[in-house]
Amino acid sequence: MLDIKFLRANFEEVKEKLQHRGEDLADFECFEELDTKRRELLVQTEELKSKRNEVSQQISMLKREKKDAEALILEMREVGEKIKGLDNELREVEEDLERLMLSIPNIPHESTPVGETEDDNVVVRTWGEVKEFNFEPKPHWDLATDLGIVDFERAGKVTGSRFVFYKGAGARLERALISFMLDLHTEEHGYEEVLPPYMVNRASMTGTGQLPKFEEDAFLIESEDYFLIPTAEVPVTNMHRDEILSAEQLPIRYAAFSSCFRSEAGSAGRDTRGLIRQHQFNKVELVKFVKPEESYEELEKLTNDAERVLQLLELPYRVMSMCTGDLGFTAAKKYDIEVWLPSYDTYREISSCSNFEAFQARRANIRFRREPNAKPEPVHTLNGSGLAIGRTVAAILENYQQEDGTIIIPEVLRPYMGGKTVIK
């Protein structure tokens, strides 16, 4: 959520920056009208309440003097009815303003490239050499199915499309990657491990920005009004909702493994085969709470931490700076890390690393004090995938495949695979 005082003072500047996002600003235009109306109602209400207090004192004085106060009592009742009407009107205006504020996306940082589509994203750096195969590389879903380490067909029978059973070496590879990533981030990168709940309430989904705008993308348990988490970012960020932290506690860095659940509404026809776009998938998420002046330095560190996973796995990748039109609702700046997938003959996203500045912190009321008696101010929050497990499995299968269909296990994973060197 944006700072309403900043928005009020810089309306045209914010409007211009949101236009760079390609946003429909029809609702945004209502802000000034609603904000003005709210402030007018507050003034009117306070004036009437002040008048009511004065009349109440006059009535008390007349009663003490045994004088007739009936006219003033009637006047006070009329004032009370007016206050009641204004309070109801104010409540409606504030609810409309709250809905509007929750629907306005974050302002892009000045370093975010201006553009309309993914074609305008900027390559920041590349790492690793793309392997040249002397045979036609297979897609990961064929490799995994032929090896018997996944079963899409039976998962479809048990649940539906875009689910998978991992089996044997496939299940162990998934588990190995989870352990490897958590060990790396906690032992070398300084994160604290968290195992979060997989269900959250509406306040949590609103705090991180999934609600109200993206409810159709989430799985709702209607009987409880809980949501299955689309990412561990939601429960982990909301761990500190409605809290005031001390400056000494910052930065806070969490690494959380979880399953993630997404309806992928509107993605029919895209990545319908394989592990790239599943309704349920595993991910290690990195979440940070930092001082505002440190957040962009922490974004670079966060991105480097996610990159380190791919470097140790020796998987070629590139880092993209996302343009304003491809930034996402909550981010002020975002990097996508894209891993090379031979069967696609291109790079595909495996991690997004974002700085939300104070956007989520305002929604979730997460603040800190610089000094013990200082006024609380919003923290800056960041998060990134470190990494998406299924997509990492896909990248390993495709980049480490041999002509006979076997898979060389990356050296760094072999201790987690019981010393095995090949999946066959």
From Swiss-Prot:
Primary site of residence: cytoplasm
EC class of the enzyme, as a word: ligase
UniProt: ATP binding residues: R262, S263, E264, E349, I350, S351, S352
Keywords: Aminoacyl-tRNA synthetase, ATP-binding, Cytoplasm, Ligase, Nucleotide-binding, Protein biosynthesis
Keyword tRNA-binding: no
GO biological process: selenocysteine biosynthetic process; seryl-tRNA aminoacylation
GO cellular component, one term: cytoplasm
Pathway where it operates: Aminoacyl-tRNA biosynthesis; selenocysteinyl-tRNA(Sec) biosynthesis; L-seryl-tRNA(Sec) from L-serine and tRNA(Sec): step 1/1
Source domain of life: Bacteria
CDD domains documented for this protein: SerRS_core
This enzyme's EC code(s): 6.1.1.11
Reactions that this protein is recorded to catalyse: tRNA(Ser) + L-serine + ATP = L-seryl-tRNA(Ser) + AMP + diphosphate + H(+); tRNA(Sec) + L-serine + ATP = L-seryl-tRNA(Sec) + AMP + diphosphate + H(+)
Keyword Aminoacyl-tRNA synthetase found: yes
InterPro entries documented for this protein: aa-tRNA-synt_IIb, aa-tRNA-synth_II, aa-tRNA-synth_II/BPL/LPL, Ser-tRNA-ligase_type_1, Ser-tRNA-synth_1_N, SerRS_1_N_sf, SerRS_core, tRNA-bd_arm
Compartments it resides in: Cytoplasm
Short name of any one Pfam family annotated for the protein: Seryl_tRNA_N
Molecular-function annotations in GO: ATP binding; catalytic activity, acting on a protein; serine-tRNA ligase activity; transferase activity
Binding site for L-serine: T231, A232, E233, E285, S385
Domain notes: Consists of two distinct domains, a catalytic core and a N-terminal extension that is involved in tRNA binding.
Oligomer and partners: Homodimer. The tRNA molecule binds across the dimer.
Family: Belongs to the class-II aminoacyl-tRNA synthetase family. Type-1 seryl-tRNA synthetase subfamily.
Protein's job: Catalyzes the attachment of serine to tRNA(Ser). Is also able to aminoacylate tRNA(Sec) with serine, to form the misacylated tRNA L-seryl-tRNA(Sec), which will be further converted into selenocysteinyl-tRNA(Sec).
Record PANTHER family: SERINE--TRNA LIGASE (PTHR43697:SF1), SERYL-TRNA SYNTHETASE (PTHR43697)
Protein name: Serine--tRNA ligase
Species whose genome carries this gene: Bacillus cytotoxicus (strain DSM 22905 / CIP 110041 / 391-98 / NVH 391-98)
Encoding gene per record: serS
